[in-house]
A protein has these predicted regions:
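Coupling/hinge elements of helicase-like and P-loop NTPase modules
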Residues: 39-52, 181-195
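Conserved helicase NTPase motor core
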Residues: 20-24, 28, 70-189
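Residues at alpha-helix termini
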Residues: 35, 61, 103-104, 190
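Conserved P-loop NTPase-based nucleic-acid remodeling module centered on helicase motor cores
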Residues: 1-73, 81
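A generic structural motif
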Residues: 1, 158-162, 194-195
């Protein structure tokens, strides 16, 4: 996103060697190959589509801000041995993939996480006004950045499509209504006035 690029340049954290989709697939294939002996259920032997499935899974985990440690913790709460194994193997694949990527590349799927880490350490946007337009909802990864911006910027504005005559439970407005509730809660927790 433009905000990521701006903050990265402002703070000297620009990414030079960004991984592309083709290279992501190669690195995932290498990660699965490296783990062949350790994987019981998610083995890549004879399963060419596993690379695509695991790339999508890693992407979904990052967007949802679910860490491999959280997957491992969840596996301890599960009685089903197959699910427990899948959670642990997914965590192992994710860790191995990230380790291989980090040796040579910057993963753009981590940009929002990197941005939020910068915002938490250094309030570089404290005198800025940020306007969000055209969003009805946010991923968890995006929400972490949004919360930092609500807390740190001099003003943050959001345009959401809501029907003032309903409670927002209608399907058409449900996502925007849920987003509004989340944003309102963030502002309340961080002592930010809502106008």
């Amino acid at each position: 996103s433009r905000l990521c690029k701006y903050v990265f340049e402002l703070t000297g954290n620009s990414a030079d060697n960004v991984i592309d989709e083709g290279t992501r697939a190669v690195v995932m294939s290498l990660a699965l190959e490296e783990l062949t002996e350790k994987l019981r259920l998610l083995s890549s032997k004879g399963n060419k589509s596993l690379v695509d499935v695991m790339l999508q899974t890693v992407s979904d985990l990052k967007k949802s801000s679910v860490t491999s440690d959280e997957l491992r913790s969840a596996s301890m709460l599960v009685c089903d041995e197959t699910l427990k194994t899948k959670l642990n193997e997914t965590a192992l694949i994710s860790d191995t993939f990230d380790a291989l990527v980090s040796q040579s590349y910057i993963d753009p799927m981590d940009d929002l996480t990197r941005l939020n880490d910068i915002l938490l350490k250094n309030n570089v946007l404290r005198n800025y006004t940020i306007i969000f337009d055209g969003f009805s909802g946010f991923t968890m990864q995006q929400l972490k950045v949004v919360r930092s911006l609500i807390r740190d910027c001099s003003a943050t504005y959001f345009t959401l499509t809501l029907d003032p005559l309903t409670d927002g439970s209608e399907e058409v407005f449900a996502t925007s209504q849920q987003t509004y509730k989340i944003l309102k809660e963030y502002a309340k927790r961080d002592g930010v006035d809502i106008k």
